[in-house]
Amino acid sequence: MSWSSIKLSRLPDATISVWGHTATISGEKDIVIFGGFDFCIEKPTNTTYILHTSQTNGLTKPSVSGSLPPPIYGHSSTQVGRKMFVFGGSLQDNVQVNDMYQFNTSNYSWSKPRPMGEPPIPRYGHSASLIYDNYILIFGGNNTKSSKPLNDIHIFNTERNSWTKPSSNSSTGEIIFNPHDISPRSSTTTPTHQSVNGSNSNSSSSSRVRSATISSHNNSPIVMPLNNNNNNNNNSNNSNNSNNNGGGSPMTTPPTLQQLHLSQLMANGIGMGGSISNGNSDSPPLTPSMMALESSMLNGFKSPLSLSQRLLRSGFRSSPPSARYFHSCSVINGKAFIFGGYNGTTLLNDLYILNIESMEWICPHTKGDLPTPRAGHTSIAIGSRLFIFGGTIEGDPSSSNAHCDNDLYMFEPELNYWTLLKTSGTLPSPRTGHVCLPISSKILIIGGSDAILNNKLKLSNTYHSLETLKLDFSHYSRGGSGGGSNNNIIIHPITSSNSTSSNSIITNYLPHLKPRSSSNSGGGGGSITNTPTTSSLHIKDNSASPSPLTPRSIARNSPKSSIFHDNINNNSNNNLLNTLQEASKFELSPGTPKSIRGIDSLSSVSLTQSIDRNGGSGGGSGGGNGVVSNDRGEFLRHYTTQSILINKNNNNNNNNNSGGSNLSISSNSGSNNSINSNDGLVLQCSTPLCIKKYNSLKDSYLELKQKYQEEREKRLELEKELERYRLSSPITSASSLVDTLSSPNNLNINSNNSTTTTTTTTTTTTTPIPLSTSNNNNNNNNNSTLTVQDQVTTSKQILEIYEDIYNLWGYYEKRVKWKENTEKEANQQLEVIKSKIDLFTSMVGLENHFSFNDDTKSCCSENINGDHNQQQQQQQQQNPQFQIDDNISETNSQISEPALIHETLTPRKSRENSVHHSRSVSNPIPLLSQIVKQSKSGDSTLTVPQQLHSSHNNLIQLASISTPQKPPQQPQQQQQQQPPQENGKEPSKSTQKIFKLLISKKNRASGHFKLSSSNESSNSEETTPTFSNNPNLINDEDDDSQQHQQQTNIGSNSISNINTSNSTTSLSSSVSSTSLQTQEEFEASERSKQKKRLGKALKQMINKDRQLKETAAAALAVSNSNGNLGGGGGGGSINGTTNVSGNGANNLGGLVLTSDKEKEKLEKEREKSERIEREKQEKEREKLEKEREKSERIEREKLEKAEKERLEKEKIEKEKLEKKHKKIKGLFGAKSSNKESLPFRRDVIEKVINHLRENSLDTEGIFRLSGNMESVRGIVKSFAHGEPNLSFEVHNISNALKHYLRSLDPPLIPYEFFLMLLDARKNEDAETIRNIFWKIPSDNRVVLTLLVDLMVKISENSNVNKMNSKNLSIVFGPTILKPRTPTLDRMALMTETQLQCGIIQTFIEDFHYIFSEFPTSGPKSFLGDDDYDSSSFGSNNTPSSHSPHSSSPTLNPAVTTTTTTTTTTNTTTTTNTTTTPTSATISPNIIQTNNCDSALCTPTTLSSTAAIIQSNNNNRTDSNRNN
C-alpha cells in the first residue's frame, strides 16, 4: 500500500497553491477544481482548472464564459450530472456569501440561477453532499457576523433551483421532513466530495501535543459503556477510569428516541439481558435467527424504561450534532457521516450519522483507532468504507499555532470500527484545506497547505494517489474484550505524545495476547495488584506481507508525578495505561518459535515499570479513584521480529515516587534466561469459536516452526560461506565488519550474580550473526544496567552493519557469477568462430596455410575438427611468425597484428585456383577479405561462358588437391615445391562430401563464393594472399617456380579430368551453377530461374565430357601404338596425384582446340536457352497479370456490391427517418424538405433586410402571413445566385427570407452554441447569452445583428403591424436556432421550442445590452415586472397590443417609447383558395402584447406553446393553399 506522486503539468509554474478550494469529478476521470485562497498572492481566486487524470501532465486552464463567481474560498461544490454547483464561501474582506452558481462542464460556461425559497444564511466551511441524484444537503458552517458556528440543514433542488429547510422539534431534536417530498429516484447515492477548509500552519520539528477529545455536546457528557475500556471519548474534567464491569458513573437524562428501527439496533450490537457490547468488542455479527429471537424478546418487554436504557447504552442520539465548521460529510448507503470539525473553541472528533430516509441523527460508539480531533480534513467514501485524511489537529485552524498531519484513517460502518492505515511511498505532506476525491478505487489528494496564510509556502507541482484495492486488512485485526468473553486481544499501535520527563522508546508492533482468565470482576475500587507469572511470547507471522516489517520507534513520555490527572485526557497516555494494566491479564501462548526469520536466540530482558495511582482504597463503583500497584510490572517490547521474553521479578523495588516512570533492562537473579519450546498450545476455552481459533493458531505455529528450521539451516550454510569468504575474498570491509561484530567489546550486557545473557538481532535477510557475550563480574550491579534506549541503539547498529555485510556479499556473488558466465560465453563464442573458420578454410583449400594460436584450450575445436589442432601446432612450429590472434569480436573485427609488425611475413604457396569466401556482414573476416580484394578486379571482367569454364577448371584443380595420393617415385625438386604434408594423413573429409556440403548451403545468406582472378588464362601469374598489414608484399623468389608449377598442373589436371567419374563431373556442374549465382548483374529474384535455365546447359556439357573421354581414349590408343608418350604411364603431377590413364602432355593441344569450339556451342546453347526461358517467363508474367486483374475485378465487384447494398440500406433508413420527422414536424407546422442547403450569402441577406426595413414596418402580419409559394421559391433561387429579386410583394420577400434562413446548414447561429444558449435561457442569465453571442463568427454575428435590429423596429410598431417581440420570437426561434440532431420526443421538443423562442425574445428585449460592444445599461428582460396576463388567453377579443416597454432597447439608446396604445379588433380568418393572400387579423392565441419574462420556463406558458403550434399550422395551411 504505497502513495504515488504524479506531476500536474510540464510547466514549472502550473501549481495549485491554494487551500480552501473545491473539486468535483466530471465524467469518469476528469476533475474540475475551482477557487480557494492562493497563499502565494495572499488573496482568494476564482480560477477554474481541469485535471485529466488519465493523462500525464493533465492540468489545463480552460477558457470559461458566463457569470463567474467572485474570488472565494471555504465554499462547497457538488457535481450533478454535467453541472457543478458551487455554494457559499468567504470573500477577501472576510464577508460570506450565500449565492449558488453552476458550472457546465461540457461547454465550460458559468451561470447564476435564480433560486426559489429562502436560501441559507451566508456561510463558509460548511459541507455539501449529493442525495437522491439531484438534491444537495448543506450542513453546518460559520458566519463571522453571527460570531458562532451553525448546525442547521438545508436542501437544494437542482432541477427546480429551490431551497428547502427541514424544521426540527425543539423538545426531541427530531428533524421533521418528509422524504417523499423530494421524490427520490433511486436509493443509490453517489459519494460526492465535500469542501472543507482550514487555516494552515507550519509543522514544527518537535513533537506535537494533540488537543483534547470533545466529550460532550450541548454540555451533556457522552454516555460511556459500563466496561470502561473504550477511550474514544474522554471527559476533560474527569480522570476517573472505572475498572468495574458491574456498574458505571451516573448519567444525565437522555432525550427520548423517535422512530428507532430494530435493524438499526441490531446493527449497533445491542445485547439482551441488560448487557451491552464493549467498545473493543469483537463479537460476531447477528444472524437472522438471532435477530428474530431479539425481535421476539423486544416485543415481550413491557417496561419501556429497560428498552430506552439499552438504547442509550448503545450510543443512539436523536439530537443534532453541535455547531461546527471545517468538518467533513460523506454519504454511504443513504446515510450521511459527519465527522470532526471546529466549534470555535475546540477541535472535535465525534461521528454523527444522519439517516436520510427518516431524517434521524445517530451518534454511535466507535471502536479501534479513533482519529484525533481535527478540522480542515477531508473524507471520501469508497465502497462501504469511509476514509479520512489530514487536517488541523491542534489549535485554531486559522491561527499560527495550528498543526497538521497526514494520517489516513478508515472507518467501517458495519462494524463501527476505526483503523489507522500505515502507508509507504511518497506520502503527501501534512496539510489542511486540501481536496480528496475518489477515482474508481483510488484516493487522490490535491492542493492544500501545511502553513499559515502569511507564510506563502508553495506546494510542489504534484498530486498524490493511493490505490485502496491493494490495502491488506490482514494486519488490522478487529479485536477486543467485551465482558471478558473474548479470547483474542489485539493491542493497537500507541500514538505519540510528549512531556518534559524522560523519554522511553517503545515500538508499535505489539504481539497478540491471550486472556489469562475469562473474567475480570471486582465489586469495589480498592487496590488491584498484578501478580507476575511466567509467559511466553506469540509472534504474529508477517512473512506474507508485501513490505518488510520495519520498526518505528515512538517516544512515550511518563508523567511528572504518579498522579495522572494532568495528562489523563491524552489518547496516547490512556492507551499506554490500558496496555500496562492489561499486560498482567493475559498470558502469551506457549510454544511460539523463537523467530520468523531465523533468530538464533532470544535475550531475556526484564523491563521495570512502576506506576502509582493515588486515591481512596476500598471505594465502590461511584467512589474515589482506585490504586493500582504494579511492582516491577510487566511491559511488553517487540522490536521488529525480535522477541523479548518478559520475566517477572518478584523483587520489590520501590520506584513509585521517583519522579517518573523508570524503564530499564536487567536480568533475573540466579537464573539462566532461555526459552522452552513447547509443541502444544494451551486451550483454555471450550467454545466452538475458541476451538476454531486454536486449530488455526496451531496450524500456523507448526508451519512457522517448519519455516524456522529451514531458515536456520540456511543460516548455518551462509555462516560457512561467510567464513570462507572472509578468508579468501579480497574485500576486507565485510570481513572486518564481521570481526567487529564478533568482538566481545561491542556489546556488554551485565547480569546479576554471573548470569549468562544472550542478545540476538535479526535482519531482512533472515540470517542473523551470532554475537558473543561477556560476563563482567567486576562491575557494580547498580551501575551496569543497560537502558532500553541504549540497547535499541546498539541493536539498530548491529542490524545496519549486518545488512551491509549481506548486501556486499550478495553483490559480490552476483558479480562473480556474472563474470564466470560472461567468460564462459565469450570462450564458447570464440571457439565456435575458430572452428567455423578452420572448417571453412579446410573446405576451400586453405587448411595448410595458416592456423590459430590456441593459447587457451578450446573444448569446441577438439570436438569439431578432430586432429586439426595437431596440424595447427605443426604449422606454427614450421612458421612461427605466421599466426593469427584469437581476439575476434563483433565490435573489433580486425585481427591483431603479429609480434613483428614491420617485418614482411613469408606466406606459404597457395593453390592456384581456390574458391574464396566473402561474408555479407558489416565486419567481414580480415583474412578472407584480403583474398577477395585481390581477386575482385579480375572476376568482374569475366563473361558468363568464361566463368563457367573457369569454374569447371577450378573444380578439377580442387578435386585433384583434395584427394592426395603419395606417388611411388617423386623427383627431389618436386618434393621441395610441394606443401608440407601432415605425416601422410589425409583430410578428415573427402572432396565429394565437401562439395555436397557447399551445394546444400547454396542459398546461405552469410556470403557468396567467388573465383580468383587466376582462372582467366592458364599462363597468368598466381596471386598469393599475405597476412601482414601490407597485402601487396609478394615473395618474388618463388614466382618462377610457381608459374612453372602452375603450367604443369594445368596440363596434368586437364588430362586427369578426362578420366574422372560422372559424380565428379556432376559436382563440377553444381559448383559452376553455384558460381553463376554470385554474379551481381542477375537479380536475386531470378536466381532460381537461372539455375533451372543453366541446368540444361550443364547436361549438354556432361554429354560433351563423355565425347571428350571417348576421343581421348582413341588418341591414347594411337599414341601408345606410335610410342609418343610424354612422361610415361606413371607420370606424376606436382601434388602427387597419379594420372589414371597414364597419358602425357602431348594431347594438350588438341584439347585446347576442342575447348574453343565447345565455348562457341555452349554460348549458342546458352543464348537459345535464355531466349526460351525469357519467352516462358513472359508467358508466366502475362498469366499472373491476368489472374491478378481477374481477382482485382472480382474483389472490386464485391466491394461495389457491398457499397451499393449499404447505400440502399442507408437510403431506406433515411426515408424512414424523414417520414418520421415529417410526421412529427407536420404536427408543429414545419414542412419537411429534402432540398440541399443553400450557401450563406451575407450581402444578399443585408439587401433583403434593408428592403424590409424600408417597406415592411407598417405591414400587418409581417413575417406571419405567407405569400405565393411559387414567387417565394423564385426569390429564394435568386438569393442563391447573389442577385435577389425584390420586385415582389413584401409578404413574398419576408417569407423568402424565412425559407432561406431555414435552409442554411449550419444555421445562422451555429450548432455548437445551441445547448449553451438553452442553458443560459433556462437560468435566465442574460450575461451568459451576451458572452455567447460575441463568440459567434463575425459574418453570422453581423447578419444576426441586422435581423434582430429589424425585429426590434417591427416590435416597436406593433400597434400597427400586430407583431410584438413574442410573436416575432415564435417565427424566428426555430428558424435561426436549431439543434444538429432533431428532437424526437414530443415533450422535449415542446420544452426546446419554448427556450428557442425565449432566446429570440431576449435578443429583442435586451438588444442594446447584448449586441452593443460597450453596453450602457444592464439586462432588463428578466426583471419580472412586465409578466403577461394569463387571463387574456382564451378570450374572444384580440388582446391589446402594448408598445415596447420603457426599458426596451432601440437603435438610439436615448430614444424610448413610454406610451401604451390599446386597440381592439375583431378576429377574422380567411379560408379562400385564391392564389393571392388576403389580409387577416391575428388570432388571440397567437399575438402576445406583453413582454415575456420567465413565463416561458414555467408550466403556465403552455398557451405560448399552443400559439407556436397554431402559428406553424397556419404557415402550413397558407403554404398548401398557395401551392
Curated annotation (Swiss-Prot):
Domain of life: Eukaryota
Subcellular location as annotated: Cytoplasm
Record's keyword annotation contains Cytoplasm: yes
InterPro entries given in the database record: Kelch-typ_b-propeller (IPR015915), Rho_GTPase_activation_prot (IPR008936), RhoGAP_dom (IPR000198)
Coiled-coil region: 690-729, 812-840, 1151-1228
Biased composition annotated in UniProt, kind: Low complexity: 195-211, 227-244, 870-881, 971-981, 1012-1030, 1043-1079, 1143-1153, 1430-1476
Major localisation: cytoplasm
Disulphides: none
UniProt-listed SUPFAM superfamilies: GTPase activation domain, GAP (SSF48350), Kelch motif (SSF117281)
One Gene Ontology CC term in the entry: cytoplasm
Compositional bias ranges of the Basic and acidic residues kind: 905-915, 1155-1194
Gene Ontology BP term (one): signal transduction
Kelch repeat spans: 30-76, 83-133, 135-184, 335-384, 386-441, 443-496
Disordered: annotated span: 161-256, 510-569, 609-631, 647-671, 748-786, 861-881, 905-927, 963-991, 1006-1096, 1143-1194, 1425-1482
Pfam family, one: Kelch_KLHDC2_KLHL20_DRC7
Residue numbers marked as site, Arginine finger: R1264
GO molecular function, one term: GTPase activator activity
Functional note: Rho GTPase-activating protein involved in the signal transduction pathway.
The protein's name: Rho GTPase-activating protein gacHH
Organism: Dictyostelium discoideum
Gene: gacHH
